[in-house]
Amino acid sequence: MATKEFYFAIIGHCDQPIFEMDFPVGEKKTKESEGTRHLNHYIGHAALDIVDEHALTTSQMYLKMVDKFNEWYVSAFVTASRIRFIMLHTHRADEGIKQFFQEMYETYIKHAMNPFYEIDDVIESPAFEQKATLYGRKYLS
């Protein structure tokens, strides 16, 4: 059975990633995984236009699977402030991804309410990363 792989990114208003994480967390990084990371960036950014089109046609925040590239599915979540959450995944896990997005949205809102955080700044908070890891293990495994 192939391993389940996930790549999560929060994309800001100017299409720049403000947070990224690979799941499963803790895997050893190899040259091949670095190449995969670059491919994930490409796939995620290529899907942004499709995400924006879907966001205009629905009032739902969770957009489910919006695109597929080779073995990677792309799911998305658009916040009320138009910050995009992108999830690349090799296995269909719609309910788990939806729950993960909802938990990360709540975590992002709490982080964004910090008076020292500027919207669209890169998120470098260890607490935010720990929450993402926790929710990834809880909902994506």
UniProtKB/Swiss-Prot annotation:
Kindly give the InterPro entries that the UniProt entry links to this protein.
Answer: Longin-like_dom_sf, Sedlin
Q: Look up the domain of life of the source.
A: Eukaryota
Q: Which Pfam families match?
A: Sedlin_N
Please report the organism this UniProt entry assigns to the protein.
Answer: Caenorhabditis elegans
Per UniProt, which keywords does this protein have?
Cytoplasm, Endoplasmic reticulum, ER-Golgi transport, Golgi apparatus, Transport
Q: What role is this protein assigned?
A: May play a role in vesicular transport from endoplasmic reticulum to Golgi. Required for the systemic spread of the RNAi response.
Gene name tied to this protein: sedl-1
Query: Main localization of the protein?
Result: cytoplasm
One biological process term from GO is: endoplasmic reticulum to Golgi vesicle-mediated transport
- Put simply, this protein is called Probable trafficking protein particle complex subunit 2
Family matches, as CDD domains: TRAPPC2_sedlin (cd14825)
One cellular component GO annotation, for this chain's record? cytoplasm
Assembly, in brief, is:
Part of the multisubunit TRAPP (transport protein particle) complex.
Q: Where does the record place it?
A: Cytoplasm, Perinuclear region; Endoplasmic reticulum; Golgi apparatus
Q: Spell out the family assignment given in the record's similarity comment.
A: Belongs to the TRAPP small subunits family. Sedlin subfamily.
